């Protein structure tokens, strides 16, 4: 039976990670399993920055964003010699199992440790929602709400000055944040990696929108990486329409903030089940939520899945562009 479990968060932080950590600690305590915290992700695992969770008030982090055990990117972990040191650091403390919370890069690290004999469970922690072995990743719902709040405020000032404003959101190739924030805010144009429009096409729509009586604002929601220079695109739209057009890149504000209620619930469920699966002797699996049920997928299979639900997102983006422009 598992006696000791370590927890680490890796890659980009996301709201809800603290809730997952809390659930792991509490569920493990229920079964007399000791938990250890690995500080600063795989970098900390390599450097031996591992401490018992005893004395930590995990409840105090339930409403905090980010990750209280911190995160880091450590590309050297792809090399076996670094992973071997990390494994030895776990074994020296008698730690038999590890829960890794992060995105696809974190999943790759978790899989390698599983292959080296460490019992490993991966949980999807990223705002991008690009781990498709789960309907929702930890951090996505909060980021979506953050974007909606920001765009609502941007709409206020755009309406005051009769402007078009382009808003770039994160997603790292996945279009979920752009599409669903665009739906929620009534963005007149949604452009993503799954549904692209040219500058001329956008300008035509903007011009038509402002021909409506009393129309005061147009919001264009754009996924990151669609355009290399959003300021330049905004300038081109302004030149084609004679409508003042600004560009706003929301950037890292999307990764911060207190987790939403749904986030806390999802993260708690996944954290609890990570312990239960390890207790059952399972390893090398990624947990997620599919149709509100906990689903387990081998990490290798999860990594092989497309990072975007392209066909669905493309259809929905076109459909809701049509609706929002009506």
From Swiss-Prot:
Essential cofactor(s): Mg(2+)
GO terms assigned for molecular function: 6-phosphofructokinase activity; AMP binding; ATP binding; fructose-6-phosphate binding; identical protein binding; metal ion binding; monosaccharide binding
A biological-process GO annotation: fructose 6-phosphate metabolic process
Active site as annotated: 128 (proton acceptor)
Residues that coordinate or bind ATP: 12, 73-74, 103-106
Keywords recorded for this protein, A-Z: Allosteric enzyme, ATP-binding, Cytoplasm, Glycolysis, Kinase, Magnesium, Metal-binding, Nucleotide-binding, Transferase
Binding of substrate, residues: 126-128, 163, 170-172, 224, 246, 252-255
EC number, as in UniProt: 2.7.1.11
The family this protein is said to belong to: Belongs to the phosphofructokinase type A (PFKA) family. ATP-dependent PFK group I subfamily. Prokaryotic clade 'B1' sub-subfamily.
Reported function: Catalyzes the phosphorylation of D-fructose 6-phosphate to fructose 1,6-bisphosphate by ATP, the first committing step of glycolysis.
Subunit structure: Homotetramer.
Name of the protein: ATP-dependent 6-phosphofructokinase
Gene responsible for this protein: pfkA
């Amino acid at each position: 039976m598992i006696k000791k479990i370590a927890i680490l968060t890796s890659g980009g932080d996301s709201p809800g990670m603290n809730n997952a950590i809390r659930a792991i600690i509490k569920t493990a305590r229920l079964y007399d399993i000791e938990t250890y915290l690995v500080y600063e992700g795989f970098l900390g695992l390599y450097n031996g920055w591992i401490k018992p969770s005893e004395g930590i008030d995990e409840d105090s982090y339930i409403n905090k964003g980010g990750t209280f055990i911190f995160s880091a990117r450590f590309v050297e972990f792809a090399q076996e010699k670094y992973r071997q040191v990390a494994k030895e650091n776990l074994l020296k403390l008698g730690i038999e199992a590890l829960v890794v919370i992060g995105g696809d890069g974190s999943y790759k690290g978790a899989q390698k440790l599983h292959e080296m004999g460490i019992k490993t469970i991966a949980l999807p922690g990223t705002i991008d929602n690009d781990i498709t072995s789960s309907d929702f990743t930890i951090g996505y719902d909060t980021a979506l709400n953050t974007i909606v709040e920001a765009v609502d405020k941007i709409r206020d000032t755009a309406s005051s000055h009769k402007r078009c404003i382009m808003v770039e959101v994160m997603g790292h190739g996945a279009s979920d944040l752009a599409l669903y924030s665009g739906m929620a805010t009534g963005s007149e144009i949604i452009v993503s990696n799954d549904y692209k429009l040219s500058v001329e096409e956008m300008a035509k729509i903007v011009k038509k929108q402002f021909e409506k009586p009393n129309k005061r604002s147009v919001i264009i929601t754009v996924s990151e990486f669609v355009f290399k220079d959003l300021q330049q695109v905004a300038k081109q739209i302004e030149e084609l329409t004679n409508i003042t057009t600004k560009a706003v890149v929301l950037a890292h504000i999307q990764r911060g903030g207190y987790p939403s209620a749904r986030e806390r619930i999802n993260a708690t469920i996944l954290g609890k089940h990570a312990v239960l699966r390890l207790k059952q002797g399972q390893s090398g699996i990624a947990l997620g939520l599919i149709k509100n049920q906990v689903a387990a997928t081998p990490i290798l299979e999860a990594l092989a899945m497309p990072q975007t639900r392209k066909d669905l997102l493309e259809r929905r983006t076109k459909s809701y562009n049509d609706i929002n422009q009506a």
